[in-house]
Amino acid sequence: MSVHPRNQGKDDCCEKTHLDSQYSPGYYWLGNNTLKVPLVLHKENRQRLVSQILSKHKDQVKENSFILLESGKSTMQYDTDHEPLFKQERYFFWTFGSDIPDCFGIVGLDEQATSILCIPKLPAEYATWMGEIRSKEYYKSIFLVDQVLYVDEMMDYLKSKNASTIYTILGTNTDSGSTFVEPQYPGLRETFNVNNTLLFPEIAECRVIKSPKEVEVIRYCVDASVSAHKHVMRKVKVGLKEYQCESEFLHHVYNEWGCRNVGYTCICAANKNSAVLHYGHAGEPNSATISENGFCLFDMGAEYHSYTADITCSFPATGKFSPEQRVVYQAVLDASVAVMEAMRPGVSWVDMHKLAERCILAALLKAGILVGDLQDLIANKIGSVFFPHGLGHFLGLDTHDVGGYLGDCQPKVHSLRTTRTLKAGMVITSEPGCYFINHLLTQALSNPETAKFFNLTELDKYRNIGGVRIEDDILVTETGCDNLSKNLPRTIDEIEAFMLK
C-alpha cells in the first residue's frame, strides 16, 4: 500500500482495518496517498489546555474539577427523515478528535488530563441501517482516551469523583456574533457547581496557536487545495460554466487526496461575479458562463480531518492578462508580497491591513484611476471602496477560526476579523483584494467629499473586471512566516506560462 510521503517512517496502520474504516488504533487515515493523522494530536491538545488552565488559574481551580464538553447533535433536515452529513462541533473535535454525534467529553483538571469520552447507547436497529455498533473498547483504542462511558453513565461518574466544579464553554464567536451553547444535560446544574466563564478564552486561545501536528494536517489541506486549484486553472476555458470549475475542484480533492468535504461553499466567480465577495451561495450558485474577457476569482479550500485550507486564485479565463487586468492584479500581488515580507511575531495585524491598503491605493493612483494625495485617500477611507474586507483571518478547524478578538487584541476594527499581534504558531490567511463593486462606487461617487478622488474616464475602463483577490495560508514562525500555499503560480508571468502549457 502506497503511503503519503509525510507518513514515511511512521508506524503503519493495519491494512485490513482500512478496508472497513478510516480509523485504526490511534490514527485517522484513508489509505493510499492520504495523510495518516496520529490522534495523539488531540491528547496533546487536552494536555496543552489543562496545563494552560492550571498555570494561569491554579488558585481558582479546586481539586476534582473537570471540563465538560458536548459534541454536535445529530439532526434531520427540517421535518424530513433525511439526516444531513454530520460535521462535528469544533471545540469538541479539537479536544477529542471524535466525529461521533450526541456525545459528551470529560477532561480532568489534573496533571494527567484524564479523559473520558461519553458515547450514546445505540439501539439494535442502528446496526441494520447505519452499520456495526462499536464497543467502548474500540473507541478507547481509537481516540486514545482513558475511559469510554455511555452518556447515561456520565452523571454517576462525576458523582463518584466528587466533582467540585464543572467548567463549560460559554462565549460569543466574534465572526458570527453567535453565542456558544453550553452542554445541556438533565440535572447537571442542580447537582454540580458549574463555571461557564473560565474555559472559553482558554480553549479558544489554545486553538489560536497550532501544534506541530495540527500544522501538518493544515499543510496537507493546503497541498490538496493547491493541487486542485492548479488542476482547475488548466481546465478553465471560455464557455465553461462556473459550476463545472467547482466540480473539478471537488472531484480532485476527494479522488486524489481523500478530502470528502471542503471548508466552505466554493466561490467560483467569473466575469463581474468576481466582485461579489461571497459568491457561490444558493442565490448565486456558480451558474454563469465564463465569457471571452472573463476574469476568474476562485476561492476554494479542501478539508481533511476537520481542518481546512482557504485559498483564492485570480486569473484571466484566456490565460492572458489584458492591460487593465494586469494593473489590478499587480496591485494586489504587490500588496500580498509586501505583507508576507513584513509578517513576523510582534507585528500588528492592523498594520498589515493598512500596508496592503496603501499598496493597492498607490497602484490605483499610478494607473490614474484615482487622483490626489495618498494620505488624503486613506483619511477619506477610499481604500474600503476597493478593499472592503479585512486582510485575513485565523485558519484551522474553522475557516474563520476562533480567537480573533482575544488576548492582546486592539478594539474591533470594521471588517477586520482580528486586530491581534502576530505570534509564532498562528495560521492566518493573507488575502488582499481589489474590487469594482457597483454599489460601493456609486456611494463614493455620489458624495462630493469622496467623488473628487476618482478619474471617471479611467475608472470606466476597469469596472468590468469585477475583482481580484490573492489568498494564501500563512504560518507565523519564530523568525518570519511560511507561505504554505507558495507552490501556486502567482506572478503574471507564472500564471500565463502555466495556463498556456
Curated annotation (Swiss-Prot):
Enzyme class, first EC level, given as a word: hydrolase
Disulphide bonds in the chain: none
Keyword Hydrolase: yes
One Gene Ontology molecular-function label: metalloaminopeptidase activity
Annotated binding of Mn(2+) 2, by residue: 310, 393, 431, 471
UniProt keyword list: Dipeptidase, Hydrolase, Manganese, Metal-binding, Metalloprotease, Protease
Any one of the GO BP annotations: proteolysis
Annotated EC: 3.4.13.9
Cofactor: Mn(2+)
Signal peptide: none
Domain of life: Eukaryota
UniProt catalytic activity: Xaa-L-Pro dipeptide + H2O = an L-alpha-amino acid + L-proline
Subunit structure comment from the entry: Homodimer.
Job description of the protein: Dipeptidase that catalyzes the hydrolysis of dipeptides with a prolyl (Xaa-Pro) or hydroxyprolyl residue in the C-terminal position.
Name of the protein: Xaa-Pro dipeptidase
